[in-house]
Amino acid sequence: MEKDVASLSSDTPIVVFSHIPLFAMYPDWGWGTDDATQALSYLKRFASVTCLNGHVHQVFSKTEGNVTFHSGTTTAYPLPHPGDGPAPKPLTLPAGKLHDALGIREVSYQTGQHTLALKERTLL
């Protein structure tokens, strides 16, 4: 990461994708990255940094200084919230409820005469 950002201007928006969160979300369950402090130190000089991760199967957002973190929900199976139980074991849901708990969405569009625009929305 240090080499990747070394030549960039500090006003360059940075987006980092990682599987495990770059902050200590819940270390007892392995929901954090051991070298996160070092990785984030390379990004301190940038005005806008967004870190996106999975692993925790939870929608979660927080901001620390110039860095905004977003954890995405699951596309496989739901996990309990941090600390609910001794370990992050898959939750059992009633029949027919699994699809509602997953981060699977269908997106459709109709071809028109204008370029398709993407609209950013805040994660809830």
Please identify what each model-predicted range represents.
Residues 60-124:
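Binuclear metal-dependent phosphoesterase catalytic core
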Residues 1-68:
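His/acidic metal-ligating clusters that form di-metal
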